[in-house]
């Protein structure tokens, strides 16, 4: 048995072409359309987009870009909220070990902006989010939150 397996393996490795069998589709296109199930699209009451960056001007230009995208795709836009920045301060010594009176002061400010999109279907939301994620500027981070609409369970409806 082991000898047969070794001979099969050696013949497969020696041959330059591999024999692969594929099954041709024998289903008519009309029947194929019936097979595909129609799933209902998700509905979102709101999508909250939060984006952060260190440059205030970059966030402002990205905000105008998002507003223009909403206008052209006819997506209803909710509130635009500019949150206060987060300040991070780190004092450090100039020297490695001594000279405590010579210090450096490192500071970063993270500016935060939130934009809300209202009443969107799942396909529109995925297209919109893919487009804005492809065009996000360098140094800007994004966080997206969804609020999905779902029907009540049958136990509550009755």
Curated annotation (Swiss-Prot):
The cellular component terms of Gene Ontology attached to this UniProt record, alphabetical and capped at eight, are: mitochondrial small ribosomal subunit; mitochondrion
- Quick check: keyword Chloroplast in the entry? no
Q: Which Gene3D superfamilies match?
A: Ribosomal protein S10 domain
Q: Which Pfam families match?
A: Ribosomal_S10 (PF00338)
Q: Where in the cell is it found?
A: Mitochondrion
Q: Which domain of life is it from?
A: Eukaryota
Q: Which UniProt keywords apply?
A: Mitochondrion, Ribonucleoprotein, Ribosomal protein
What InterPro entries does the entry give? Answer: Ribosomal_uS10_dom, Ribosomal_uS10_dom_sf, Ribosomal_uS10m
**Would you identify the family this protein belongs to, as annotated?**
Belongs to the universal ribosomal protein uS10 family.
Its protein name is: Small ribosomal subunit protein uS10m
Q: Which gene encodes it?
A: mrps-10
